[in-house]
Amino acid sequence: MNTKKLITFILWAFVPMVGIGIAMHLIGGSGAGVNTDPADINIVQTLIASALSAAAMFLPLIAVIMTQLTFKEPVLKGLDINFKINKWWVIGALLIPVLTMATVGMSLLMPGAKWDTNSELMQMSLQGMPEGFGVWALIGISMISGLIAGITINGLFAFGEEIAWRGFLLKEFKGKKFLTTALWTGTIWGLWHAPIIINGHNYPEHPVAGVFMMTIFCILFTPILMYFRQRSGSVIIAAIMHGVFNGIAGISLLIISPFNDLLYGATGLAGFITLLIANICIYLYDRHISKENIYTSLID
C-alpha cells in the first residue's frame, strides 16, 4: 500500500466535501427532519441541499482522477470498470430490496416503533395514485422504481463514489485481508460523509451522533458491496447496489411513525442488525458452500 498516495486521495476527497458541508450550513442545513410536518418544509432549502448531496457523490471520482494524475498513473486502469453481466449482478441488485424489507421488519421490533399507514407522509405519497392503491402497492412500485433508478440515474451518481470506495481503494489495499480492507474502506467512506451528516443529512434529529452512526453503517455495508464487486469482477454492480439502496432505503419513513433516525431504517440500529445478519449469512455461504472463498482471502 502506498501511504502517500492514500493520503493524497483522502485529501482530494475530504477537503471539497468540507466545502459542500459549509455550503449546506449556509443554507440552513439539509432541510426537513424525519418528523417535520410537510407543511413546514422549506422546499427551496431542501432542493438545494439535495443538489449539494448529489454533487458530492462525484467528489470521490474526482479525487481518484486527481490522485492518479498526481502520481502519473493511468487514471482508471485496474479498477474493473466493465459491463460483463453475470448472475452476481442480478443477485446483488435484488438483495437490496430484500434487505430493505428486512430492515422494516427489524425496525418494527425496536422500542416505540409503530406501523402507521395513516401518516401524513404516507397519505401524501398515495395522492395521485389510482383509486384502490394501498400501502403494499406503493411499496411494490417503490421497489420497482428503485431498481430501475439503481440501474440508471442513481447508479450513475453512485458510480461517482463506488469507483473510489470499491475501485481505487481495493486496488490500493491489494494484498491485504478482505475484512481488514472492508474495515478501513468503510471507515473512510463513513467519515467522508461527516460534513453533510453534521448538517442533518440522514440523521436530522441527531446530527452529531449521526457521524458515528453513518460510519458504523458504512463499515457494515462495505463487506457486502465488496463481496459482490469481487464475485462479479466489476465495480459496476457496487454502483448499482448503492444506487438501488439510495432509491428505496427511505421506505421505512413512510410506514413507521414517529420516526427515530438512530433506531429505525437502514441507517439506524435496525439497519445495522440487518446488515450484520446479512454479512454472517454471506460469510457462511462463502466459507462452507462457495468454491471461491473471498471473506477469508486477500484482496487480489
Regions found by a protein language model. Name each.
Residues 159-188, 230-234:
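Membrane-interface helix/loop boundary segments of multi-pass membrane proteins
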Residues 12-21, 90-107, 226-238:
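Hydrophobic alpha-helical membrane-insertion segments
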Residues 21, 61, 194-197, 246-251, ...:
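Hydrophobic transmembrane alpha-helices of multi-pass small-molecule transporters
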Residues 103-123:
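Functional transmembrane-helix hotspots
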Residues 20-70, 81, 87-97, 117-141, ...:
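Alpha-helical transmembrane segments in multi-pass membrane proteins
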Residues 1-11:
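N-terminal membrane topogenic signal
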Residues 207-208, 233, 241-300:
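C-terminal membrane module of polytopic membrane proteins
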Residues 10, 14, 58, 93-97, ...:
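Residue-level signature of the transmembrane alpha-helical core
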